[in-house]
Curated annotation (Swiss-Prot):
Keyword field: Endoplasmic reticulum, Hydrolase, Nucleus, Protease, Thiol protease, Ubl conjugation pathway
Classification of source organism: Eukaryota, Metazoa, Chordata, Craniata, Vertebrata
Catalytic-site annotation from UniProt: C89 (nucleophile), H334 (proton acceptor)
Biased composition (Basic and acidic residues): 382-392, 398-410
Reactions catalysed: Thiol-dependent hydrolysis of ester, thioester, amide, peptide and isopeptide bonds formed by the C-terminal Gly of ubiquitin (a 76-residue protein attached to proteins as an intracellular targeting signal)
Comp. bias (Polar residues): 496-505
Record protein name field: Ubiquitin carboxyl-terminal hydrolase 17-like protein 10
UniProt-listed Enzyme Commission number(s): 3.4.19.12
């Protein structure tokens, strides 16, 4: 069930949206995705839902429609490397994966949002637009990511790359909503971010006594895959959509026959995203131990077997980015990424170093997060690049492909980021801090019967939760070259309370990886014993 393209005939097509209706007029979509701020849905899992092709009218259409000029289209070659500012490899790896996401990058280069944005300060879409535009148009250089990109998240310690990635995506989603409280939830699903990353789960329960069917639909922005018993991404997806029998103590209370009866429950993808973010759950529990086994993933992935509607032809996705964590546990390690430039060449992005790679090398990594895009989307964006390529002062073809950005930096001095307005960091921190985001997430998320990411965990009673991250950062000496921090926002040393409440970027040493678990339903806490 392949949707219309985001980009057709030189025009943006963010207006087509796969839609659902319910036999109940008050049915709505439960915002349960762990990377968004959920709102409780009145849609009952005991309500029979009929599917059709159209959704109830939305109050506002929030996606762009304009046609981008040729000069705004992205260059075909790889862009700049990113300077590690002290424990920020997780930021750099995540930003590189977002930068080379064709629908998002092309939209950012068009600069439509910043032309109409009224926030001016603290807007993640404007901040990402500036970063992506800068990174893609100065290949061969090394740049410093803006401090505002991690304001409210980075605390001078190594954080989880996937968590930062989805924190950023959610901040961009909010930036698409002018006047959050005045926008209905159906309109929220028409935003640029949701139409690029968003899809819907369909949980169907069939009563084996009366054969009544109940459907529940829940949005997602990423898909978490349990890899403990899987040897490949395809096996993990098969396990995810495998039918489950409900009987005995777990029998289903049917809303049709009003009896407690055996039932079958099936979870499928009703609407698949333009861009798939697949998270391999390598840190599944509170111990911090990493599942370090190799999990095979293909260059081309057919998602049709996991869709609600079958026999509609292949739904092929192509791999364009891989986020990698190197290390044996959550307590140490390093993040890097592999991205596919629009020219078709793969590159390894390791902070400031950018080196050409091959698909063979890419597919042999211990992947943490995989990024796939619908094949038709990739081909259309590649074609637009070949038609509208901009001249470049320095391209990858002008240098030895084996050279790293670190080597190029000697000939092309590192571009320093402009001084950041203190009010920008302060406002961004106040509007979207990590603790506040997670607190609202835990308070507001719904508890549907199907919970594909549940991992039980407990917190000892004799600890004080200071920061919602599972593990303390353990400083190592594996990277002495980073012992001198490059990022120092304040000459004063904050108190413990100030460190807890502010999201300012503090300077710490090393690239040591701090532990993280991947289940968003269990609390992530940095614990200090009382």
């Amino acid at each position: 069930m392949e949707d219309d393209s985001l980009y057709l005939g030189g025009e943006w097509q963010f207006n087509h949206f796969s839609k659902l209706t319910s036999s109940r007029p008050d049915a709505a979509f439960a915002e349960i995705q762990r990377t968004s701020l959920p709102e409780k849905s009145p849609l009952s899992c005991e309500t029979r839902v009929d599917l059709c092709d159209d959704l109830a009218p939305v109050a506002r259409q929030l996606a762009p429609r304009e046609k981008p000029p040729l000069s705004s289209r992205r260059p075909a070659a790889v862009g700049a490397g990113l300077q590690n500012m002290g424990n920020t490899c997780y930021v750099n790896a995540s930003l590189q994966c977002l930068t080379y996401k064709p629908p998002l990058a092309n939209y950012m280069l068009f600069r439509e949002h910043s032309q109409t944005c009224h926030r001016h300060k603290g807007c993640m879409l404007c901040t990402m637009q500036a970063h992506i535009t800068r990174a893609l148009h100065i290949p061969g250089h090394v740049i410093q990511p803006s401090q505002a990109l991690a304001a409210g998240f980075h605390r001078g310690k190594q954080e989880d790359a996937h968590e930062f990635l989805m924190f950023t995506v959610d901040a961009m989603r909010k930036a698409c909503l002018p006047g959050h409280k005045q926008v209905d939830r159906h309109s929220k699903d028409t935003t640029l971010i949701h139409q690029i990353f968003g899809g819907y789960w369909r949980s169907q329960i069939k009563c084996l006594h009366c054969h009544g069917i109940s459907d529940t639909f829940d949005p997602y922005l990423d898909i978490a895959l349990d890899i403990q018993a899987a040897q490949s991404v395809q096996q993990a997806l098969e396990q995810l959509v495998k039918p489950e029998e409900l009987n005995g103590e777990n029998a289903y209370h049917c809303g049709v026959c009003l009896q407690r009866a055996p039932a079958s429950k099936t979870l499928t993808l009703h609407n698949s995203a333009k861009v798939l973010i697949l998270v391999l759950k390598r840190f599944p529990d509170v111990t911090g131990n990493k599942i370090a086994k190799n999990v095979q993933y293909p260059e081309c992935l057919d998602m049709q077997p996991y869709m609600s509607q079958q026999n509609t032809g292949p739904l092929v996705y192509v791999l364009y980015a891989v986020l990698v964590h190197a290390g044996w546990s959550c307590h140490n390690g390093h993040y890097s990424s592999y991205v596919k430039a629009q020219e078709g060449q793969w590159y390894k992005m390791d902070d400031a170093e950018v080196t050409a790679s091959s698909i063979t090398s890419v597919l042999s990594q211990q992947a943490y997060v995989l990024f796939y895009i619908q094949k038709s989307e990739w081909e259309r964006h590649s074609e637009s690049v070949s038609r509208g390529r901009e001249p470049r002062a320095l391209g990858v073809e002008d240098t030895d492909r084996r050279a790293t950005q670190g080597e190029l930096k000697r000939d092309h001095p590192c571009l320093q980021a402009p001084e950041l307005d203190e009010h920008l960091v302060e406002r961004a921190t106040q509007e979207s801090t990590l603790d506040h985001w997670k607190f609202l997430q835990e308070q507001n998320k719904t508890k549907p019967e199907f919970n594909v990411r549940r991992v039980e965990g407990t917190v000892p009673p004799d600890v004080l939760v200071i920061h919602q991250s599972k593990y303390k950062c353990r400083m190592k000496n594996h990277h002495p070259e980073q012992q001198s921090s490059l990022l120092n926002l304040s000459s004063t040393t904050p108190t413990d309370q100030e460190s807890m409440n502010t999201g300012t970027l503090a300077s710490l040493r090393g690239r040591t990886r701090r532990s993280k678990g991947k289940n968003k339903h269990s609390k992530r806490a940095l614990l200090v014993c009382q």
